[in-house]
Amino acid sequence: MDYKNIDFCHDYDDGKILSDLNDADVILLGPSRVGKTPLSFYMGYFDLKVCNIPLVPEANLTEMLKSLPREKTFGLTRSVDSIRKHRLSREENLGINSNYATEERIFDELMYAHDIYKTLRIPVIDLDKMAIEEATVFISKRISK
């Protein structure tokens, strides 16, 4: 197995690199703890170069996001409760207490993300309703058209 696509997923994980996005086969957008990284790496094992970008209202990436190629850009979502469960676990593991896991913060981030998805006119995948394997098939079919 050639791991170059896994290396690509690692290098482009969590918005670490926002240049040369045309090299990516797939671009995933979503709030923190929505499932971008597991989906990215799973797709990497299937020979896809995946970049994932966290959507944080304070980062104000709207103009940059408008330049993304829509045919390979996908929005990810989950319920507030699902994201909150993952964020509370993360806070506990890190020994911190912040507004990162509050329902209000998560709701605001989801609203921001969905506004971006609507502006970009991209497909939205609910990872509460679709396993990463199913999401991979869905995305693969969309990008191979």
Please state what every model-predicted region is.
Residues Y3-D13, S98-A135:
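Small-molecule kinase domains that catalyze NTP-dependent phosphoryl transfer to phosphate-bearing small molecules
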Residues Y3-K49:
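Internal active-site segments that recognize and position negatively charged phosphoryl groups
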Residues V50-L61:
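Short beta-strand-centered segment that lines the nucleotide-binding/catalytic pocket of NTP-utilizing
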Residues C51-I53, K72-L76, P123-I125:
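Hydrophobic/aromatic beta-strand patches that form the interior of the parallel beta-sheet core
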Residues P54-L55, P123, K141-K145:
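Terminal helix/beta-alpha structural elements that buttress the NAD(P)+-binding lobe
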Residues P57-A59, S79-I83, A131-I132:
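Conserved nucleotide-binding/hydrolysis micro-motifs of P-loop NTPases
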Residues R70-D108:
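A glycine- and Lys/Arg-enriched "phosphate-lid" helix/loop adjacent to the NTP-binding pocket
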